[in-house]
A protein has these predicted regions:
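Fe(II)/2-oxoglutarate oxygenase catalytic core
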Residues: 1-279
Length: 279
Protein backbone atom coordinates (compact mmCIF):
# COMPACT_ATOMS: atom_id res chain seq x y z
CA UNK A 1 0.00 0.00 0.00
CA UNK A 2 2.63 2.57 1.06
CA UNK A 3 5.17 3.08 -1.71
CA UNK A 4 8.58 2.13 -0.34
CA UNK A 5 10.17 4.47 -2.89
CA UNK A 6 8.06 7.51 -2.06
CA UNK A 7 9.89 10.83 -1.83
CA UNK A 8 9.74 12.40 1.64
CA UNK A 9 10.70 16.04 2.21
CA UNK A 10 10.78 17.43 5.75
CA UNK A 11 10.57 21.11 6.69
CA UNK A 12 10.92 22.80 10.09
CA UNK A 13 10.02 26.39 9.16
CA UNK A 14 7.66 28.13 9.69
CA UNK A 15 6.29 25.02 11.41
CA UNK A 16 7.06 21.32 10.97
CA UNK A 17 5.50 19.86 7.82
CA UNK A 18 6.21 17.06 5.38
CA UNK A 19 5.54 16.52 1.68
CA UNK A 20 5.40 12.93 0.43
CA UNK A 21 5.24 12.42 -3.33
CA UNK A 22 4.05 9.07 -4.76
CA UNK A 23 2.86 8.15 -1.28
CA UNK A 24 0.87 5.06 -2.31
CA UNK A 25 1.83 2.21 -4.61
CA UNK A 26 0.93 3.10 -8.19
CA UNK A 27 -1.69 0.38 -8.77
CA UNK A 28 -3.33 0.84 -5.37
CA UNK A 29 -3.50 4.60 -5.90
CA UNK A 30 -5.01 4.13 -9.38
CA UNK A 31 -7.78 1.93 -7.98
CA UNK A 32 -8.63 4.59 -5.41
CA UNK A 33 -8.61 7.36 -8.01
CA UNK A 34 -10.93 5.67 -10.51
CA UNK A 35 -13.30 4.55 -7.74
CA UNK A 36 -13.50 7.94 -5.98
CA UNK A 37 -17.14 9.01 -5.53
CA UNK A 38 -18.62 11.21 -8.25
CA UNK A 39 -20.26 14.54 -7.45
CA UNK A 40 -23.61 12.89 -8.18
CA UNK A 41 -22.83 10.26 -5.52
CA UNK A 42 -22.16 12.96 -2.94
CA UNK A 43 -25.33 14.86 -3.90
CA UNK A 44 -27.60 11.86 -3.36
CA UNK A 45 -26.09 10.84 -0.02
CA UNK A 46 -26.41 12.17 3.50
CA UNK A 47 -23.40 14.01 4.88
CA UNK A 48 -22.14 14.92 8.33
CA UNK A 49 -19.10 17.04 7.43
CA UNK A 50 -18.90 20.41 5.69
CA UNK A 51 -15.15 20.62 5.20
CA UNK A 52 -15.33 20.60 1.38
CA UNK A 53 -18.13 21.31 -1.11
CA UNK A 54 -18.99 17.63 -1.01
CA UNK A 55 -17.66 15.10 1.48
CA UNK A 56 -18.29 11.92 3.41
CA UNK A 57 -16.83 10.23 6.45
CA UNK A 58 -17.24 7.19 8.69
CA UNK A 59 -20.89 6.57 9.51
CA UNK A 60 -22.31 8.20 6.37
CA UNK A 61 -24.22 5.99 3.92
CA UNK A 62 -21.90 6.81 1.01
CA UNK A 63 -18.86 5.90 3.10
CA UNK A 64 -20.45 2.60 4.17
CA UNK A 65 -21.33 1.79 0.55
CA UNK A 66 -17.78 2.54 -0.58
CA UNK A 67 -16.28 0.16 1.98
CA UNK A 68 -18.81 -2.56 1.20
CA UNK A 69 -18.26 -2.47 -2.57
CA UNK A 70 -14.61 -1.54 -3.02
CA UNK A 71 -11.70 -3.59 -1.70
CA UNK A 72 -9.14 -0.78 -2.11
CA UNK A 73 -11.17 1.65 -0.01
CA UNK A 74 -11.80 -1.04 2.56
CA UNK A 75 -8.06 -1.66 2.85
CA UNK A 76 -7.39 2.09 3.07
CA UNK A 77 -9.96 2.45 5.85
CA UNK A 78 -8.39 -0.46 7.75
CA UNK A 79 -4.96 1.15 7.41
CA UNK A 80 -6.04 4.64 8.51
CA UNK A 81 -7.92 3.24 11.51
CA UNK A 82 -4.91 1.34 12.79
CA UNK A 83 -1.99 1.81 15.16
CA UNK A 84 0.31 1.31 12.18
CA UNK A 85 -0.91 4.53 10.53
CA UNK A 86 -0.60 6.57 13.71
CA UNK A 87 2.84 5.22 14.60
CA UNK A 88 4.13 5.85 11.07
CA UNK A 89 3.45 9.58 11.30
CA UNK A 90 4.39 9.90 14.96
CA UNK A 91 7.79 8.55 14.00
CA UNK A 92 8.14 11.06 11.15
CA UNK A 93 7.38 13.95 13.52
CA UNK A 94 8.90 12.44 16.67
CA UNK A 95 11.72 14.96 17.14
CA UNK A 96 9.42 17.90 16.37
CA UNK A 97 6.81 16.66 18.84
CA UNK A 98 9.47 16.23 21.53
CA UNK A 99 10.74 19.77 20.91
CA UNK A 100 7.21 21.20 21.21
CA UNK A 101 6.70 19.38 24.51
CA UNK A 102 10.11 20.37 25.91
CA UNK A 103 9.34 24.02 25.11
CA UNK A 104 5.89 23.82 26.75
CA UNK A 105 4.02 24.46 23.51
CA UNK A 106 2.53 20.97 23.76
CA UNK A 107 0.88 20.64 27.15
CA UNK A 108 0.68 16.84 27.00
CA UNK A 109 3.31 14.14 26.47
CA UNK A 110 1.41 12.70 23.52
CA UNK A 111 4.19 10.31 22.50
CA UNK A 112 3.30 8.25 25.58
CA UNK A 113 -0.45 8.32 24.98
CA UNK A 114 -2.42 5.16 24.35
CA UNK A 115 -3.75 4.71 20.81
CA UNK A 116 -7.44 4.22 20.09
CA UNK A 117 -7.58 3.07 16.49
CA UNK A 118 -11.39 2.92 16.36
CA UNK A 119 -13.50 5.78 14.91
CA UNK A 120 -13.90 8.31 17.73
CA UNK A 121 -14.63 11.70 16.18
CA UNK A 122 -17.55 10.35 14.17
CA UNK A 123 -19.43 12.63 11.79
CA UNK A 124 -19.20 16.26 12.84
CA UNK A 125 -15.90 17.91 13.76
CA UNK A 126 -15.23 18.33 17.48
CA UNK A 127 -14.68 21.99 18.39
CA UNK A 128 -13.00 23.64 21.37
CA UNK A 129 -16.32 24.08 23.23
CA UNK A 130 -17.04 20.35 23.36
CA UNK A 131 -14.14 19.12 25.48
CA UNK A 132 -14.35 18.10 29.12
CA UNK A 133 -11.64 17.21 31.62
CA UNK A 134 -13.22 13.80 32.18
CA UNK A 135 -12.12 12.25 28.90
CA UNK A 136 -9.56 9.48 28.87
CA UNK A 137 -6.38 10.61 27.13
CA UNK A 138 -5.53 8.86 23.86
CA UNK A 139 -4.69 9.48 20.21
CA UNK A 140 -7.11 8.58 17.45
CA UNK A 141 -7.30 8.78 13.62
CA UNK A 142 -9.85 10.33 11.25
CA UNK A 143 -10.48 10.19 7.50
CA UNK A 144 -12.83 12.28 5.34
CA UNK A 145 -13.22 12.03 1.56
CA UNK A 146 -14.24 15.14 -0.32
CA UNK A 147 -14.41 17.17 -3.51
CA UNK A 148 -13.92 20.88 -4.10
CA UNK A 149 -15.40 22.80 -7.04
CA UNK A 150 -15.23 26.43 -8.21
CA UNK A 151 -15.17 28.75 -5.20
CA UNK A 152 -13.83 26.12 -2.81
CA UNK A 153 -11.63 27.80 -0.20
CA UNK A 154 -13.61 31.04 0.10
CA UNK A 155 -16.06 30.04 2.81
CA UNK A 156 -15.11 26.42 3.43
CA UNK A 157 -11.88 24.46 3.67
CA UNK A 158 -11.25 26.22 6.97
CA UNK A 159 -12.73 29.54 5.88
CA UNK A 160 -9.46 31.33 5.21
CA UNK A 161 -6.15 31.33 7.06
CA UNK A 162 -6.41 29.27 10.23
CA UNK A 163 -4.89 26.63 12.51
CA UNK A 164 -6.86 23.45 13.12
CA UNK A 165 -8.86 22.62 16.25
CA UNK A 166 -6.98 22.24 19.57
CA UNK A 167 -7.12 18.43 19.56
CA UNK A 168 -5.37 18.13 16.18
CA UNK A 169 -1.81 16.88 16.53
CA UNK A 170 -1.06 16.09 12.88
CA UNK A 171 -3.26 17.10 9.94
CA UNK A 172 -2.87 15.59 6.48
CA UNK A 173 -4.16 16.25 3.00
CA UNK A 174 -3.88 13.63 0.27
CA UNK A 175 -4.62 14.61 -3.32
CA UNK A 176 -6.38 12.13 -5.55
CA UNK A 177 -6.93 13.93 -8.86
CA UNK A 178 -10.40 14.57 -10.25
CA UNK A 179 -9.66 17.49 -12.56
CA UNK A 180 -8.24 18.13 -16.03
CA UNK A 181 -7.40 21.78 -15.40
CA UNK A 182 -7.43 23.93 -12.28
CA UNK A 183 -6.65 27.51 -11.30
CA UNK A 184 -6.33 27.84 -7.53
CA UNK A 185 -7.00 25.01 -5.11
CA UNK A 186 -3.42 25.08 -3.78
CA UNK A 187 -2.55 24.37 -0.15
CA UNK A 188 -0.82 27.47 1.21
CA UNK A 189 1.65 27.60 4.09
CA UNK A 190 1.78 30.98 5.86
CA UNK A 191 4.39 32.53 8.15
CA UNK A 192 4.34 35.49 10.50
CA UNK A 193 5.77 38.72 9.11
CA UNK A 194 8.81 40.35 10.68
CA UNK A 195 6.68 42.50 12.97
CA UNK A 196 4.39 39.54 13.83
CA UNK A 197 1.27 41.54 12.98
CA UNK A 198 0.65 40.07 9.54
CA UNK A 199 1.09 36.82 7.64
CA UNK A 200 3.02 36.20 4.43
CA UNK A 201 2.83 33.21 2.10
CA UNK A 202 5.75 30.85 2.72
CA UNK A 203 4.93 28.12 0.19
CA UNK A 204 2.18 27.24 -2.25
CA UNK A 205 1.70 23.50 -2.84
CA UNK A 206 -0.12 22.36 -5.97
CA UNK A 207 -2.78 19.61 -5.66
CA UNK A 208 -0.73 16.92 -7.41
CA UNK A 209 -1.94 13.34 -7.65
CA UNK A 210 -0.68 10.88 -5.02
CA UNK A 211 0.90 13.66 -2.96
CA UNK A 212 0.41 13.83 0.80
CA UNK A 213 1.01 16.91 2.94
CA UNK A 214 1.29 16.38 6.70
CA UNK A 215 1.80 19.14 9.25
CA UNK A 216 2.25 19.36 12.98
CA UNK A 217 -0.58 21.65 14.06
CA UNK A 218 1.30 23.80 16.54
CA UNK A 219 0.31 27.39 17.24
CA UNK A 220 2.24 28.63 14.20
CA UNK A 221 0.67 26.20 11.70
CA UNK A 222 -1.16 28.84 9.67
CA UNK A 223 -2.54 27.48 6.40
CA UNK A 224 -5.41 27.84 3.97
CA UNK A 225 -6.76 26.85 0.57
CA UNK A 226 -6.11 29.19 -2.33
CA UNK A 227 -9.74 29.51 -3.56
CA UNK A 228 -10.50 27.68 -6.79
CA UNK A 229 -11.09 30.22 -9.56
CA UNK A 230 -11.57 27.74 -12.40
CA UNK A 231 -11.74 23.97 -12.60
CA UNK A 232 -12.58 21.30 -15.14
CA UNK A 233 -13.73 18.47 -12.90
CA UNK A 234 -13.25 18.54 -9.13
CA UNK A 235 -10.37 18.72 -6.66
CA UNK A 236 -10.61 15.35 -4.92
CA UNK A 237 -8.81 14.72 -1.66
CA UNK A 238 -8.68 12.80 1.60
CA UNK A 239 -8.45 14.76 4.82
CA UNK A 240 -6.59 12.66 7.39
CA UNK A 241 -5.74 13.49 10.98
CA UNK A 242 -4.16 12.19 14.16
CA UNK A 243 -5.79 13.85 17.13
CA UNK A 244 -6.03 13.71 20.90
CA UNK A 245 -9.14 13.09 22.96
CA UNK A 246 -8.25 16.26 24.91
CA UNK A 247 -6.74 19.60 23.81
CA UNK A 248 -2.95 19.32 23.71
CA UNK A 249 -1.68 22.74 22.59
CA UNK A 250 -0.92 25.73 24.79
CA UNK A 251 -3.87 28.11 24.88
CA UNK A 252 -3.57 31.24 22.79
CA UNK A 253 -4.07 34.67 24.34
CA UNK A 254 -6.86 36.82 22.96
CA UNK A 255 -5.76 39.50 20.52
CA UNK A 256 -7.01 40.89 17.22
CA UNK A 257 -4.43 38.74 15.45
CA UNK A 258 -5.35 35.47 17.20
CA UNK A 259 -9.10 36.09 16.92
CA UNK A 260 -8.66 36.56 13.17
CA UNK A 261 -6.16 33.79 12.40
CA UNK A 262 -6.36 31.31 15.30
CA UNK A 263 -10.04 31.38 16.23
CA UNK A 264 -10.10 27.62 16.85
CA UNK A 265 -7.73 27.96 19.83
CA UNK A 266 -7.98 31.49 21.18
CA UNK A 267 -8.97 31.81 24.84
CA UNK A 268 -12.68 32.45 25.41
CA UNK A 269 -13.80 35.93 26.43
CA UNK A 270 -15.38 36.41 29.86
CA UNK A 271 -18.78 36.61 28.18
CA UNK A 272 -18.22 33.28 26.41
CA UNK A 273 -17.02 31.62 29.63
CA UNK A 274 -20.21 32.71 31.44
CA UNK A 275 -22.33 31.58 28.49
CA UNK A 276 -20.67 28.15 28.50
CA UNK A 277 -21.32 27.75 32.24
CA UNK A 278 -25.00 28.70 31.87
CA UNK A 279 -25.45 26.26 29.01
Amino acid sequence: MINKNCKIQKFKYPFPYIKIQDFLDKDFYKNLEISFPKISDFKTSDRSVSRMNYDTTYGDNLYKKLLANNESYRKLHEYIYSSTFIKYFLELFKNNIQDEYNNNFLTEDVLNYQINNQPFEVGHIIGKKEFTNKLEKFLYPRMDLGSGIKGYGKNNGGGGIHIDNPQRLISMLFYIGGYEKIIGGDHRIWKKSNNNNFLDIHETIKPEKNCLIASLQNNLAFHDVNPIEYIEGSRNAFYLAISSSVPVWKKVKRSKFSIKYNKNRVRNSLFQKIKNILN
